[in-house]
Amino acid sequence: MWVPSRRHLCLTFLLVCVLAAIFFLNVYQDLFYSGLDLLALCPDHNVVSSPVAIFCLAGTPVHPNASDSCPKHPASLSGTWTIYPDGRFGNQMGQYATLLALAQLNGRQAFIQPAMHAVLAPVFRITLPVLAPEVDRHAPWRELELHDWMSEDYAHLKEPWLKLTGFPCSWTFFHHLREQIRSEFTLHDHLRQEAQGVLSQFRLPRTGDRPSTFVGVHVRRGDYLRVMPKRWKGVVGDGAYLQQAMDWFRARYEAPVFVVTSNGMEWCRKNIDTSRGDVIFAGDGREAAPARDFALLVQCNHTIMTIGTFGFWAAYLAGGDTIYLANFTLPTSSFLKIFKPEAAFLPEWVGINADLSPLQMLAGP
């Protein structure tokens, strides 16, 4: 009869230990992922002491600057998607809308980061829940950097724990959800009422009547004065472009009033023709507190934008006619590798070509 040696017994014991360790590791992994799902839905479940609620229950009282309704399209698959908040106000609006649209398209639950909530919730009635920091730290994220136009691949993403990155702001991601996006970016009542109060004070110079047509004008200046010519071989909107855009509206609407906002209000006052008495410099230009200027633009009937996501979102939410600055870079600009005009501007918007002669003179023969 064969009797196992001490060596055989030791090897058998080690094999049993290895198999047991693998078994318990798999059990722990399942519990960990289940715990993350529970943590994402129930932040007060003795796991996280986050002050930010991250699951919306119907009928639960909310802060005036928080969401006022539950997500309208719950996810059909497990897992969590989020997006890294980067850039300023308009950038984060684009990131929010893209996250919402792609998560719905792929049947996942979208959560926003607390930093994005802090930027957008004081202005809009957003409904996406906020991700608990504990989940963000421990979740097995896969990252995906988005380019700024919709691709077929983005409709078939399989990762359950996905963190999107980049600066998406193309209507091709979310335009099929336009009414939902407009609902997400509904201004809080006090901002809307304040903006309407400002507009209601304006009078037509010749008759003293209240205007019936307001055209919001956003003039992007600031860091773009340096970035566009030096990095992207591009220009920002100049006085001639703004004059053309305003004349376009004057030819189509009776007595329109132009409500100018900008992060360069001093330049606007010096370079926009006010001789007709139909231009009002209403913006305060406070980049750190954009809510007031944005609310003014959204409450207008139509929009003139130059470049940038702030102007895009003002036009998208205001509706009506939109004039935008077209062909604002040289054909050789590397900006065109990451920016597709046909994916940036709605087909019904009207473009007026930029004057590139200052760049061409700098480039030489």
UniProtKB/Swiss-Prot annotation:
Q: What are the subcellular locations of this protein?
A: Golgi apparatus, Golgi stack membrane
Which cysteines form disulfides?
Answer: none
At the top of the EC hierarchy, this enzyme's class is transferase
Lumenal topological intervals? 29-365
| Biological pathway | Protein modification; protein glycosylation
Q: Which GO terms describe its biological process?
A: carbohydrate metabolic process; fucosylation; lipid metabolic process; olfactory bulb development; positive regulation of cell-matrix adhesion; positive regulation of endothelial cell migration; positive regulation of endothelial cell-matrix adhesion via fibronectin; positive regulation of sprouting angiogenesis
InterPro entries according to UniProt? Glyco_trans_11
The membrane-spanning stretches of this chain are 9-28
Task: Provide the residues annotated with a glycan attachment (glycosylation).
Answer: N65, N301, N327
> For this protein, what is the EC number?
2.4.1.69, 2.4.1.344
Q: Which GO terms describe its cellular component?
A: Golgi cisterna membrane
Under catalytic activity, the entry for this protein gives: a beta-D-galactosyl-(1->4)-N-acetyl-beta-D-glucosaminyl derivative + GDP-beta-L-fucose = an alpha-L-Fuc-(1->2)-beta-D-Gal-(1->4)-beta-D-GlcNAc derivative + GDP + H(+); a ganglioside GA1 + GDP-beta-L-fucose = a ganglioside Fuc-GA1 + GDP + H(+); a beta-D-Gal-(1->3)-beta-D-GlcNAc-(1->3)-beta-D-Gal-(1->4)-beta-D-Glc-(1<->1')-Cer(d18:1(4E)) + GDP-beta-L-fucose = alpha-L-fucosyl-(1->2)- beta-D-galactosyl-(1->3)-N-acetyl-beta-D-glucosaminyl-(1->3)-beta-D-galactosyl-(1->4)-beta-D-glucosyl-(1<->1')-N-acylsphing-4-enine + GDP + H(+); a neolactoside nLc4Cer(d18:1(4E)) + GDP-beta-L-fucose = a neolactoside IV(2)-alpha-Fuc-nLc4Cer(d18:1(4E)) + GDP + H(+)
Q: Which keywords does this Swiss-Prot/TrEMBL entry list?
A: Glycoprotein, Glycosyltransferase, Golgi apparatus, Lipid metabolism, Membrane, Signal-anchor, Transferase, Transmembrane, Transmembrane helix
User: What does it do?
Assistant: Catalyzes the transfer of L-fucose, from a guanosine diphosphate-beta-L-fucose, to the terminal galactose residue of glycoconjugates through an alpha(1,2) linkage leading to H antigen synthesis that is an intermediate substrate in the synthesis of ABO blood group antigens. H antigen is essential for maturation of the glomerular layer of the main olfactory bulb, in cell migration and early cell-cell contacts during tumor associated angiogenesis. Preferentially fucosylates soluble lactose and to a lesser extent fucosylates glycolipids gangliosides GA1 and GM1a.
Tell me its family. Belongs to the glycosyltransferase 11 family.
- Write the protein's name: Galactoside alpha-(1,2)-fucosyltransferase 1
